[in-house]
Amino acid sequence: MLLDTDAILKKHDIITIKLFSGEELVGKFEEETNEVIKIKMPLTLVASQQGIGLQQYLFTTDPRKALPIQKSALVTVTKTVKNYADAYEQQTSSIIKAPAGLADALKAN
């Protein structure tokens, strides 16, 4: 497994994992041991007519539980780029983020 050397992972960082099976997962980093990386609420990338989307990785488990992924199954691990991290947060959170600049626009009124 290759770990992006610029990616010092902290608990709750949104990370991307590429598996040897070809699947790409996005989830919240929980912890790492010698054998596994645990991620919470993993989603997988899916292609659609509207572009790339995110869907639940495992449908028959509690998505809030940290899922151990064997390091032997990993190709690489890195922090997720902002636009996909934002999409992940929006899909997994009940909090709706305000658009950028909204606070400044409200202050001006």
Mark where each language-model region is:
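Conserved RNA-binding domains used in RNP assembly and mRNA/RNA metabolism
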Residues: 2-109
